[in-house]
Regions:
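Glycine-centered flexible beta-alpha turn that most often forms the glycine-rich phosphate-binding loop
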Residues: 13
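Conserved glycine-rich beta-strand-loop-beta hairpin in the small C-terminal domain of fold type I
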Residues: 85, 92, 108-117, 128-142, ...
Length: 180
């Protein structure tokens, strides 16, 4: 409502939308109400859920006709709306026939996240894992160990071979976090 009031368009990156914990449901931003639908541009892709990132394809969903015209013009002006036939076929196949795959993938990811969380809670109790109901990524608060996750990430890489993303890559407020 605030975005609508001030004529702000919401670009909703929902690329991880199909990766949810078992029993959890993805709710598209544009489906929340008519206002959300009318001010939204939603970006989705099969790249995460079907491991198709190398095919470099995505979808842009724009329900509002005025916004859709602007998006189409922008994409076509810059010649970035030209997916190859293989990418289109792979995405269509994934979304049309991939329900069983998605269910098994989500269970597998959920179990892996549980293993990680159980290990951390038992062995590194000062780390705090931000609760998550979706995606395969975890956001970890390291403030009880250090204020600088970058140093911790470098240590983890050199001593264990584990590569994690420094939270500072996502803005100054992320400097005491890492993403795995």
């Amino acid at each position: 409502e605030l975005c609508h009031k001030y004529n702000v368009t919401v670009i909703s990156d929902e690329i991880h939308c199909d990766i949810t914990n078992p029993g959890k449901e993805y709710i598209p931003f544009a489906s929340v109400n008519d206002v959300c639908r009318d001010i939204s541009i939603t970006c989705i892709a099969g790249s995460k859920v079907f491991n198709l990132g190398g095919l470099q394809s995505a979808c842009v969903v724009v329900p509002n006709k005025f916004l859709k015209h602007k998006v189409e013009r922008g994409l076509n002006t810059d010649e970035v709306a030209e997916p190859n036939a293989f990418a289109m076929s792979a995405n269509i196949a994934g979304f049309k026939y991939g329900d069983e795959w998605v269910c098994k993938l989500n269970n597998y990811i959920y179990e892996n996240k549980k293993i990680f969380c159980d290990y951390v809670n038992k062995n590194l109790p000062k780390l705090y894992i931000i609760p998550s109901e979706a995606t395969y990524l975890l956001w970890v608060d390291v403030r009880k160990y250090t204020d600088d996750a970058t140093t911790l990430c470098e240590y983890l890489r050199s001593k264990t071979g584990l590569y994690v993303c420094e939270g500072s890559e996502y803005g100054v407020n992320g400097k005491a976090f890492f993403r795995i």
